[in-house]
From Swiss-Prot:
Protein name as catalogued: L-seryl-tRNA(Sec) selenium transferase
Chief location category: cytoplasm
A Pfam short name: Se-cys_synth_N
Organism for this UniProt entry: Shigella dysenteriae serotype 1 (strain Sd197)
Subunit annotation: Homodecamer; pentamer of dimers. Binds only one seryl-tRNA(Sec) per dimer.
Classification via InterPro entries: PyrdxlP-dep_Trfase, PyrdxlP-dep_Trfase_major, SelA-like, SelA_trans, SelA_trans_N_dom
Keyword flag Transmembrane helix: no
Length: 463
């Protein structure tokens, strides 16, 4: 060991001496003596490695308390951190999908703070059913006979198949064998449910006769899967639920549909592309329809199954139902969200998902122009800050080919180096409230469709 190396090692402080320093008193009060000591030991080991490998001291050795505070502050941050979503995707799966209405947030807080009548009947002091209130709401909103709630739509599809078709065949068009995020595939779900997939037709064309020829004595269901996260266009053919129901009645085989996104209102009245609604499919004669709570419906993550009373009863009594049931927080948020649908005239104001989807490009453009000046003043030395038109997407596999006109703030490096964009995006991800945009075509884009809190946005970006 050289004299220089020995000198560097000698500069490393003893833990006891550090702990006696007044700057560590508040750290010990905040994070606990044990955790502070553990981290100091770890940092001493790191410092010794740096000395051994590079013959230098780490820069943070100049202020141990500051480094400990920085590390423990970061460590104490929740893994689920609030972010500002300016990606242009409204229902961003990786960012938690639908924002909850204030009524839903309040309902969840109340359910967390207090015992609630989750499975308790106040009328007769007996045991109630956790789905009952929500089922009644869904029946009122959609006109269905009954409903069942589980923790997400994948669970809804699994339960629907396991309870009604285990050990039998389910007929599905080859063009509807979807895969969603996380490698969730309809054929895999069928195997888990104990069903045998009988695929018919081709990728782009399936006829009624394809279903007819597939039905045999072991057929339990005819199934439609809404291709909500992709679109097959061109030379195509598919039969709709009404035609499939007519065939099912003729062959005495029920029809079920995995709708995926599931909107309870006609989106076209808000100027958005129309998406199939559960109540329309039930009115057409479909026995069961499953859909998500946290996509176009705008509520919490949940799987909702609506349909015929006798079919729902089979789902409720299946052993999987208990394993897949939703908890009280989910049910509280979903009930509060569904109650908003009882007053459709205020829905686009009170339901965040619909409010964000219906923001006009003109309003977003004005917002972008208002924000451009302070950001250009702050970043103008390195980047050209411009207002540019862009297209938002709905996200989470909803209306995959449809785009919403919007406006963005774009940041283009004066020297044209892409590494500067990556560096800027990384800096924004390290903010107390990270700002998430997207890099495309030599620019960093901040689509402002989902920006409602301008003050917080400016506080973050002007730091």
């Amino acid at each position: 060991m050289t004299t220089e190396t020995r000198s560097l090692y000698s500069q490393l402080p003893a833990i006891d001496r550090l702990l006696r320093d007044s700057s560590f008193l508040s750290l010990r009060d905040t994070y606990g003596h044990t955790r502070v000591v553990e981290l100091l030991r770890q940092m001493l080991d790191e410092a010794r490695e740096v000395i051994r490998d590079s013959q230098t001291l780490p820069t943070w050795c100049e202020n141990w308390a500051q480094e400990v505070d920085a590390r423990l502050t970061k460590e104490a941050q929740s893994a689920l951190r609030p972010v500002i979503n300016l990606t242009g995707t409204v229902l961003h799966t990786n960012l938690g999908r639908a924002l909850q209405a204030e009524a839903a947030v309040e309902a969840v807080a109340q359910a967390m703070r207090s015992p609630v009548t989750l499975e308790y009947d106040l009328d007769d002091a007996g045991r109630g059913h956790r789905d009952r209130a929500l089922a009644q709401l869904l029946c009122r909103i959609t006109g269905v006979e009954d409903a069942c709630i589980v923790n997400n739509n994948a669970a809804a599809v699994l339960l629907m198949l396991a309870a009604t078709a285990s050990g039998k065949e389910v007929v599905v068009s080859r063009g509807e064998l979807v895969e969603i995020g996380g490698s969730f595939r309809i054929p895999d779900v069928m195997r888990q449910a104990g069903c045998t997939l009988h695929e018919v037709g081709t990728t782009n064309r399936t006829h009624a006769n394809d279903y007819r020829q597939a039905v045999n004595e072991n057929t339990a269901l005819l199934m439609k899967v809404h291709t909500s996260n992709y679109s097959i266009q061109g030379f195509t053919k598919a039969i709709d639920e009404a035609e499939l129901v007519a065939l099912g009645k003729e062959l005495d085989v029920p029809v079920v549909t995995d709708l995926g996104s599931g909107s309870l209102v006609d989106l076209s009245q808000y100027g958005l592309p129309k998406e199939p609604m559960p109540q329309e499919l039930i009115a057409a004669g479909v026995s069961l329809v499953s859909f998500s709570g946290d996509k176009l419906l705008g509520g919490p993550q949940a799987g909702i199954i609506v349909g015929k009373k006798e079919m729902i009863a089979r789902l409720q009594s299946h052993p999987l139902k208990r394993a897949l049931r939703a908890d009280k927080m989910t049910l509280a948020a979903l009930e509060a969200t569904l109650r908003l649908y009882l007053h459709p005239e205020a829905l686009s104001e009170k339901l965040p998902t619909l409010r964000l989807l219906t923001r006009s490009a003109e309003v977003i453009q004005i917002q972008a122009q208002r924000l451009q000046a302070p950001l250009a003043a702050h970043y103008g030395a390195e980047f050209a800050v411009q207002v540019m038109p862009c297209l938002s997407q709905i996200g989470s596999g909803s209306l995959p080919v449809d785009r919403l006109p919007s406006a963005a703030l774009t940041f283009t490096p004066h020297d044209g180096r892409g590494s500067h964009l990556e560096s800027l995006a990384a800096r924004w991800r390290e903010l107390p409230v990270p700002v998430i945009g997207r890099i495309y075509d030599g620019r960093l884009w901040l689509d402002l469709r989902c920006l409602e809190d301008e003050q917080r946005f400016l506080e973050m970006l002007l730091k």
